[in-house]
């Protein structure tokens, strides 16, 4: 995958609204088993107050984001506009490089594509549970 021209860096405050829009758009396109109104920009912006948000920039536009909660080395969000181009891997590699230790994350059981991605990247399922009726798997990479 050619990443020439792709920049991954910490999001600027003035970019958070665009990140929230990308978050909502990708969730609504991907999580088709949930009502679209469940995904709100306000949820992302609330979490961004305590998380580090990283963006992938290509040709001057945000094409992906990762939200990272440093106290737990927890990857809270990883969303890209185009799948299969290495954007998610670039963001994951960047967050892994700035983390203080091994990453963990949760993935909805219904999101098989994400599970496959994380397994390819060396993550293993270490826990299963549910919140508000939504089943999830916790993945960790040592």
Predicted segments with their positions:
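Short beta-strand element of the conserved SAM-dependent methyltransferase core
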Residues: 54-56, 135-141
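Alpha-helical interaction/dimerization surfaces of two-component signaling modules
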Residues: 22-26, 98, 117, 121
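Conserved active-site alpha-helix within GNAT-family acetyltransferase domains
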Residues: 89, 93, 110-136
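Conserved N-terminal entry element of GNAT/NAT acetyltransferase domains
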Residues: 1-14, 139-142
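Conserved GNAT acetyl-CoA-binding A-motif
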Residues: 98-110
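Acetyl-CoA-dependent GNAT
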Residues: 10-83, 89-94, 129
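Glycine-/small-residue-rich active-site loops that bind phosphorylated ligands and cofactors
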Residues: 83-84, 110
């Amino acid at each position: 995958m050619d990443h020439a021209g792709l920049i991954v860096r910490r999001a600027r405050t003035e970019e958070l609204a665009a990140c929230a829009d990308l978050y909502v758009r990708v969730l609504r396109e991907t999580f088709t088993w949930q009502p679209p109104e469940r995904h709100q920009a306000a949820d992302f912006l609330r979490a961004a107050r305590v998380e580090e948000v990283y963006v992938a920039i290509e040709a001057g536009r945000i094409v992906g984001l990762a939200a990272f909660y440093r106290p737990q080395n927890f990857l809270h969000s990883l969303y890209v506009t185009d799948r299969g181009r290495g954007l998610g891997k670039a963001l994951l590699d960047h967050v892994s490089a700035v983390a203080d230790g091994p990453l963990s994350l949760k993935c909805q059981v219904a999101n098989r594509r994400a599970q496959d991605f994380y397994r390819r990247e060396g993550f293993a399922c270490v826990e299963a549970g549910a919140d508000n009726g939504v089943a999830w798997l916790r993945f960790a990479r040592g």
